[in-house]
Amino acid sequence: MSKPKYPFEKRLEVVNHYFTTDDGYRIISARFGVPRTQVRTWVALYEKHGEKGLIPKPKGVSADPELRIKVVKAVIEQHMSLNQAAAHFMLAGSGSVARWLKVYEERGEAGLRALKIGTKRNIAISVDPEKAASALELSKDRRIEDLERQVRFLETRLMYLKKLKALAHPTKK
């Protein structure tokens, strides 16, 4: 598992600063180098769950399917915002909630239950030298064609500009 972007201590420092000063989200965001929406999320988590809400969640761990359904239904039935739902259910952010809503709208509860979040995709990258060489050659050919087309365009443009200049300033014989 990777290290969280913002450690617990920094989150707590930001939230404490919010409650002990009159500074708004924008000023705190600039002072601590944290996005304003992140400050807002941490404040909401702290208000709802205390310091426990600020503990970073491990990355790559997928949420329980029943929790996903509960969150989506709360957003729809209780008219919660994505940020409110994330804070209420102690989720890392509203991005997951938005993704779950989209899946729910497209495939319903079954789609949320079947959703595999946090699984790594296995993308096979071909390292065939012949294919790589032919792809490089093809890209060079395309680049040459594009440059030739651009040269023709610029030459034509220059010709029209010269013709326009000649018509605008006729020489006397």
From Swiss-Prot:
Return any one Pfam family short name: HTH_28
Family designation: Belongs to the IS150/IS1296 orfA family.
Designated name of the protein: Insertion element IS150 protein InsJ
One Gene Ontology MF term: sequence-specific DNA binding
UniProt keywords (A-Z) are: Transposable element
Query: Can the keyword Cell inner membrane be found in this entry's annotation?
Result: no
Q: Upper taxonomic classification of the species?
A: Bacteria, Pseudomonadati, Pseudomonadota, Gammaproteobacteria, Enterobacterales
Q: Which InterPro entries match?
A: InsJ-like_HTH, IS150/IS1296_orfA-like, Trp_repressor/repl_initiator, WH-like_DNA-bd_sf
